[in-house]
Amino acid sequence: MKYEKDKNWMKIALKYAYYAKEKGEIPIGAILVFKERIIGIGWNSSISKNDPTAHAEIIALRGAGKKIKNYRLLNTTLYVTLQPCIMCCGAIIQSRIKRLVFGANCNSSDHRFSLKNLFCDPQKDYKLDIKKNVMQRECSDILINFFQKKRKNKIHICKKI
C-alpha cells in the first residue's frame, strides 16, 4: 500500500523532471508532501537561473517553506527522481523533513557519500526515513536519454569544426 502511494507521488515528481528536460535543464523533479497534499514543487533550473543551487530539491523546499511560513518542514516527505547531492542533503537536514523517497541512484563523484552516515547516525538528533529505487527504471531512463542526446549533439558539433 505505502509503495503504491510512493509510486503515485513519484509519478508527479517525474512530470517535473520532464518539464525540466523540455527547458533544457538536467531532468530532475521533486515534490514535498504534507498530509497527502503537495506543498512544494521543484525541477532543476540551474542553467536558466544561472544559479548552482537551483536544484529540484532546493526549489521544492524553498517553496514549501514560503507556503507554510516556516523553514522547518516537519512531518513531510520529499519525493525526488534522483538521489540528492550533498548540498541538497544539507538542506534536507536543516529543514528536518521526515522522509526521503528517491528514484534513481547516482554514482557520480559528488554523490559518493553515504546517505546512511548523513542521516542515520545514532548520535545525531535528526533521523530520516529513506526509501530508494521507487520507479528506478523510469527515473534513470530520463537521465540516461538526456545525457546520451547531449553527448550526440557534442559529437555533431565537433565534427562540424
Swiss-Prot record:
InterPro entries: APOBEC/CMP_deaminase_Zn-bd, CMP_dCMP_dom, Cytidine_deaminase-like, tRNA_aden_deaminase
Recorded GO MF terms: tRNA-specific adenosine-34 deaminase activity; zinc ion binding
SUPFAM superfamilies per UniProt: Cytidine deaminase-like (SSF53927)
Hydrolase is among the record's keywords: yes
Residues noted as binding Zn(2+) in the record, renumbered to the chain: 55, 85, 88
GO BP annotations listed: tRNA wobble adenosine to inosine editing
Keyword line: Hydrolase, Metal-binding, tRNA processing, Zinc
TM region(s), chain numbering: none
Residue ranges occupied by any CMP/dCMP-type deaminase domain in the UniProt entry: 4-116
Co-factor requirement: Zn(2+)
Catalytic activity: adenosine(34) in tRNA + H2O + H(+) = inosine(34) in tRNA + NH4(+)
Role description: Catalyzes the deamination of adenosine to inosine at the wobble position 34 of tRNA(Arg2).
Name under which the protein is recorded: tRNA-specific adenosine deaminase
Species assigned in the record: Buchnera aphidicola subsp. Acyrthosiphon pisum (strain APS)
Source species taxonomy: Bacteria, Pseudomonadati, Pseudomonadota, Gammaproteobacteria, Enterobacterales
